[in-house]
Amino acid sequence: MVKMVSFRSKVWCGVEKGCRHLPIVLNATLVFSITAEVSYLVLMEAPLEPAQKESEWSAHWKTMHLLAQYFMLGSIAWNASLFLKTSPSIRGVFFNGDIVGQGWRYCYTCETHTPPRCSHCYDCNVCVLRRDHHCVFFGQCVGFRNYRYFLNCLLFMWAGLLYAVVMNAEVFIVILKEGVTFHSFMLLMVPWIMLVTGQVTAQAFTFAFIADTCVVGFLLVSAFLFFHVGLMLRGQTTREWYSARRPYNLGVLANVRECLGEHWYICWLCPLIPSDLPGDGINFKVTGSLDPMK
């Protein structure tokens, strides 16, 4: 009986880990699919017919496009990797019991006192320093130590998707070359149905699906990026935004430095640029009331 319970618990843990990594696999698949499709558009200058093109791209122009594209892809992958490797939790952090004061709480799950802005994540099953939210796309919490990589990843995803949308303008031109018809509308809105019913080829479906994904992804990432940039400029976390609290607003420049580190003005160019955070994730300067009602 004990062996059966142990086996079930191991299976459940495996399923749980698989579910946690599934969003990462799906996101990586989408990113590389978009990159491959845009590379094809750059190299083959498809799907426009030669008669529809005003001019052909030179080899140097194509090379510049590909270099810019793979720079953005590399930045996304590197920031995402460092985000996942950088634990935002309290594991390995020593809390001095003498400094427990206003804003501190006791976590009964972790069985320890936790500092202000720290909260327990039931998905990660641990308390997270300056916890912002649990990112379902990466399967990990966004907190004090990895916020920089999260924000930079959003920035390069936004730039990459904007570039992909512009490059996929050719796809929309081809689909809408005869105007907004029932066929073109269905191909853009529900390309899966058009493929299953045999109304379009696999190639047309692929171009339409990825073009749609680029537009939808760009809108979603734009919303996330602008929201989190706004939070950073106000010195807030998502949880503090929900409760309309701004007790840690130190001014725009200081708020940016708190999130991105001392070299905030250049660290966004490359995740390998060192940029030490000015705080420790435990003690924060307070400029307002910690009471959410004030």
Regions found by a protein language model. Give the residues of each.
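Membrane-associated feature with strongest affinity for ZDHHC
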Residues: 1-294
